[in-house]
Amino acid sequence: MRNKYIESFEKAQLENRNIPEFRAGDTVKVAVRIKEGSKERVQNYEGLCIAIRGQGTGRTFMVRKMGANSVGVERIFPLYSDSIESIEVLRKGRVRRAKLFYLRELKGKAARIKELRRK
């Protein structure tokens, strides 16, 4: 059971956010604001969403991309972070699991996810 004051505060925080609907298995592009000294830039991080966890303002999602030399790079993003400028869903994946950690052991074409066909 959650505190009603915390729930009302979180509800006010979540109202003004424009976050698309996505699930584990979807390919997403996350535009992250990075501050380097006095400069600020936006870096795109594109990969497969392999997990979503938490609730309310503490909700996070994990994105896995294949880096150089076929090395997998995973990054955890807070969903309602101010450093996230935008989230774009590129592909909807067809999976039957909520957490896709089994993809860590797969390599090459075996690690692909089928695209969800729209009716």
From Swiss-Prot:
Functional summary from the UniProt entry: This protein is located at the 30S-50S ribosomal subunit interface and may play a role in the structure and function of the aminoacyl-tRNA binding site.
InterPro entries assigned to the protein according to its UniProt record, in alphabetical order: Ribosomal_bL19, Ribosomal_bL19_CS, Ribosomal_bL19_sf, Translation_prot_SH3-like_sf
Name of the featured protein: Large ribosomal subunit protein bL19
UniProt keyword annotation of Ribosomal protein present: yes
Coiled-coil residue windows: none
Keywords linked to the UniProt accession: Ribonucleoprotein, Ribosomal protein
Gene Ontology terms: cellular component: cytosolic large ribosomal subunit
Family per similarity comment: Belongs to the bacterial ribosomal protein bL19 family.
Record carries keyword Magnesium: no
GO terms assigned for molecular function: structural constituent of ribosome
GO biological process: translation
Source superkingdom: Bacteria
